[in-house]
């Protein structure tokens, strides 16, 4: 099966649809999280009274980034082309749902996605857990293998693999994770060109 034949596309947000601007090392320092710890998993493991102010800080920090979001090369054209072809489109992000909506609005893509098909860290387990993709597959009435997960990091590809979906790596010059996917495009414009 070719990617062009697939009709159900799910996108990561930051670094995939947007130009990546998160400084995760600085976020870890600000929240006193060890350098090697996953931010969301670390916060989830904290007692509620310790996690609450850190989550609030993270949400406000990410809000500033969401309002200033800029599209990754070719992202607008890719999403619009897929919508024009009648594809179902979703977002699966480790960001908050409300900020995903702000980001899509800032990019001019808000009308391309049904809000219920935008899953953030509170609507689905954070990637690489496959729960978000499985939720969208069920909602859309398709097998997970009918989904394409487009992302810029191994968590996106691991999520796709665990769900049984197709994973596509974008916005990197090379594919450092060949064991997770053969589908790779240097950016979203190149991915659109591959679709023909």
Kindly give the residue locations of the regions a language model identified.
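Short, basic/glycine-rich phosphate-binding loops at helix/coil junctions
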Residues: 51-62, 112-117
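Active-site neighborhood of HAD-like aspartate-dependent phosphohydrolases
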Residues: 1-50, 56
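A short acidic, glycine-rich active-site loop
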Residues: 39-43, 64-65, 121-122
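Asp-based, Mg2+/Mn2+-dependent phosphohydrolase catalytic module
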Residues: 1-8, 97, 103-196
């Amino acid at each position: 099966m070719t990617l062009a034949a697939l009709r159900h596309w799910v996108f990561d947000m930051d670094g995939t649809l947007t130009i990546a601007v998160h400084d995760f090392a600085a976020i870890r320092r600000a929240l006193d999280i060890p350098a090697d710890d996953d931010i969301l998993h670390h916060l989830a493991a904290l007692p509620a009274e310790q996690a609450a102010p850190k989550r609030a800080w993270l949400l406000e920090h990410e809000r500033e980034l969401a309002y200033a979001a800029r599209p990754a090369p070719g992202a607008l054209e890719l999403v619009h082309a897929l919508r024009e072809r009648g594809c179902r489109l979703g977002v699966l992000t480790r960001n908050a749902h409300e900020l995903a909506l702000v980001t899509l609005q800032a990019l001019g893509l808000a009308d391309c996605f049904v809000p219920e098909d935008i899953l953030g860290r509170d609507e689905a387990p954070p990637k690489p857990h496959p729960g978000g993709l499985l939720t969208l597959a069920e909602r859309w009435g398709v097998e997970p293998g009918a989904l394409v997960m487009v992302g810029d990091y191994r968590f996106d590809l691991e999520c796709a693999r665990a769900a049984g979906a197709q994973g596509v790596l974008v916005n990197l010059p090379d594919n450092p994770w060949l064991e997770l996917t053969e589908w790779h495009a240097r950016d979203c414009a190149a991915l659109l060109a591959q679709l023909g």
